[in-house]
């Protein structure tokens, strides 16, 4: 009888809790989906900005066609 109670407890209480999707997980998934839609150039800009680095040298940044710093 005790074994049946343990099995019922696992399937009726623990299993639904383990499969429950938390609300806090959803914005992170939505943010990750939005990041996948970015082009490679946009991703590179975000990563370089976060790292604090530049994709070109200082003398090239004065050029009007520079898309890195502009």
UniProtKB/Swiss-Prot annotation:
Its main location: secreted. Residues 25-44 form a propeptide. Disulfide bonds join 55-68, 56-66, 61-69. Residues 1-24 form the signal peptide. Belongs to the conotoxin M superfamily. Expressed by the venom duct. Is present in all duct parts with a highest content in part 2 (proximal of the venom bulb) and then decreases in concentration toward the end of the duct. The modification Cysteine amide is found at residue 69. It comes from Conus textile (Cloth-of-gold cone). Two short peptides are produced from this precursor; Conotoxin tx3a-b is amidated at Cys-69 (but has no bromotryptophan), whereas conotoxin tx3a-a has an unmodified Gly-70 and a bromotryptophan. Two elongated peptides are also produced; Conotoxin elongated-tx3a-b is amidated at Cys-69 (but has no bromotryptophan), whereas conotoxin elongated tx3a-a has an unmodified Gly-70 (but has no bromotryptophan). The lineage of its organism: Eukaryota, Metazoa, Spiralia, Lophotrochozoa, Mollusca. It is found in: Secreted. Keywords: Amidation, Bromination, Disulfide bond, Neurotoxin, Secreted, Signal, Toxin. The cysteine framework is III (CC-C-C-CC). Classified in the M-1 branch, since 1 residue stands between the fourth and the fifth cysteine residues. GO terms for cellular component: extracellular region. The modification 6'-bromotryptophan is found at residue 58. This is Conotoxin elongated-tx3a-a. One of its GO terms (molecular function) is ion channel inhibitor activity.
């Amino acid at each position: 009888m005790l074994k049946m109670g343990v099995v019922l407890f696992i399937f009726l209480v623990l299993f639904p809790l383990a499969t429950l999707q938390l609300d806090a997980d959803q914005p992170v998934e939505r943010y990750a989906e939005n990041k996948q839609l970015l082009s490679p150039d946009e991703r590179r800009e975000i990563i370089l900005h976060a790292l604090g680095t530049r994709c070109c040298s200082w003398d090239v940044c004065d050029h009007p066609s520079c898309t890195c710093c502009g």
